[in-house]
């Protein structure tokens, strides 16, 4: 049987934040004296200085999530800044079209920071033939085997009541997709995402078969079109049935983000499942503190754990419109799921799990503290995971006969130019393994030409493939 979720609650508290917005006005009157031109010059110089200071300040605060959103507790969410969330949000804030299935302890459906981002099952929404609300008519309108599963399903009690008697599921959902800019609480990594809630554990229900519920929840997520599955539970026992469920998700192109576990052990030697199943759609995540050290409670492994993300004292939602801190690989996993949601929505990479996985793993920031702890030695960087998708190779030079063309490349992965007796060819790996050859005639000038317009997608380099 699966072990129950392991994590630590450090505190729950009420948050009060005073937001002060300063406005500066500059003005003056000009005389018609001989000093008018001098005064104008001084005013212009002063204005230029002020504009320069504003630009300098803007460059500095782009890393601050509070510079973009007015959520009062956002400054206390250190993990957002650590993972470059503000820079990422300047690129995209995600989309409600992206569905993340959160397999956990349920959710507070009426939480002020979450209720707007709950997934709505289209087959259980709207009115039925009798004019009744499909969400509450007691009928399996979409004939998927679940009655009124408008936001997900409770596999513990086998009903649509998603109430969270633990708090963990609400906390995880908040990290992934709390609403942003609503002047309440915090912001999730992907603040416009749709959260499909699948409850597999309840501390108030004894003798719950967590493994059976997990498998059922995975199958539901696959059936109902989730793009990402976030799973924070796990155990040391291998389950072929669970493996097969995750493999089915893999075949559908669904990303499975799993916690590495809080067993204080080396997962290379002592496996933790489902994070350690050898499947290409799984991202195994460990937790780090603000100094990028892996938490002493977190599992690690240079062949089994893919990447690290913030996991200590993470501020997020709790039931009853409250907020609090939790610690563990569960929280780190939610960061990565949110990042994947942003990547998918930004480039319409739905049901392409291996590609999304490669982007996230290859674009993280390397850290010496992670060299012996993860496969990639990297920590999550939301901004880089998005901008590599938009990178355009800029190069210049003249294509000539029999002479190497000199060029510079700014794109991750780069380009190579090869000699040819008659032609010059631009070669690069495109779309993860497909060779692209663009033939250019001798004498063609290629100055600041975008390689992406030739169809090239720079391929992230990952040291080892799971």
Regions found by a protein language model. Give the residues of each.
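C-terminal subdomain of the subtilisin-like protease fold in secreted/lumenal serine endopeptidases
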Residues: 3-9, 19-24, 35-43, 226-231, ...
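Acidic-leg catalytic submotif of subtilisin-like serine proteases
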Residues: 84-156, 175, 229
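Catalytic-core environment of secreted peptidases
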Residues: 147-148, 198, 287-330
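Autoinhibitory propeptides
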Residues: 2-76, 120, 452, 463-466
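Hydrolase catalytic cores
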Residues: 14, 175-176, 196-201, 227-228, ...
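Subtilisin-like peptidase catalytic core
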Residues: 105, 143, 149-237, 289, ...
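Substrate-binding/access-modulating region of protease and related hydrolase catalytic domains
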Residues: 95, 179, 197-281, 291, ...
């Amino acid at each position: 049987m699966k072990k129950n979720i392991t994590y630590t609650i450090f505190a729950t508290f009420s948050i009060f934040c005073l937001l002060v917005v300063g406005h500066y006005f500059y003005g003056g009157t000009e005389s018609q004296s001989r000093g008018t031109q001098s005064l104008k010059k001084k005013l212009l110089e002063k204005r230029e200085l002020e504009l320069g200071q504003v630009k300098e300040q803007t460059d500095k605060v782009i890393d601050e999530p509070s510079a973009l959103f007015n959520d009062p507790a956002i400054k206390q969410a250190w993990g957002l800044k650590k993972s470059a969330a503000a820079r990422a949000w300047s690129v995209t804030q995600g989309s409600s079209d992206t569905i993340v299935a959160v397999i956990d302890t349920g959710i507070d459906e009426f939480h002020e920071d979450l209720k707007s981002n709950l997934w709505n099952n289209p087959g259980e929404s709207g009115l039925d033939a009798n004019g009744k609300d499909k969400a509450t008519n007691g009928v399996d309108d979409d004939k998927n085997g679940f009655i009124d599963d408008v936001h997900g399903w409770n596999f513990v009690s086998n009903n649509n009541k998603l109430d969270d008697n633990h708090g963990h599921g609400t906390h995880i959902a908040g990290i992934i997709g709390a609403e942003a800019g609503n002047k309440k609480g915090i912001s999730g990594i992907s603040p416009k995402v749709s959260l499909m809630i699948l409850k597999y554990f309840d501390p108030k229900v004894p003798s719950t078969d967590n493994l059976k519920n997990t498998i059922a929840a995975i199958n539901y997520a696959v059936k109902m079109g989730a793009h990402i599955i976030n799973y924070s539970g796990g155990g040391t026992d291998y389950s072929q049935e669970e493996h097969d469920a995750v493999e089915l998700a893999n075949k559908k192109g669904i990303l499975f983000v799993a916690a590495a576990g809080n067993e204080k052990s080396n997962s290379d030697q002592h496996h933790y499942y489902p994070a350690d199943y050898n499947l290409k759609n799984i991202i195994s995540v460990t937790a780090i503190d603000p100094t990028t050290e892996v938490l002493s409670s977190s599992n690690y492994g240079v062949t089994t754990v893919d990447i690290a993300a913030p996991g200590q004292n993470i501020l997020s939602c709790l039931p009853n419109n409250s907020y609090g801190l939790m610690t563990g690989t569960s929280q780190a996993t939610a960061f990565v799921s949110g990042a994947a949601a942003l990547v998918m929505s930004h480039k319409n990479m739905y049901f392409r799990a291996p590609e999304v996985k490669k982007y996230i793993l290859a674009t993280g920031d390397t850290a010496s503290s992670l060299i012996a702890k993860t496969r990639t030695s990297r920590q999550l960087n939301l901004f880089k995971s998005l901008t590599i998708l938009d990178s355009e190779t800029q190069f210049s030079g003249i294509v000539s006969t029999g002479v190497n063309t000199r060029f510079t490349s700014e794109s991750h992965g780069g380009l190579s130019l090869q000699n040819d007796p008659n032609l010059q060819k631009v070669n690069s790996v495109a779309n993860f393994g497909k060779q692209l050859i663009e033939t250019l005639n001798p004498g063609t000038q290629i100055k600041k030409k975008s390689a992406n317009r030739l169809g090239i997608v720079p391929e992230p380099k990952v040291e080892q493939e799971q």
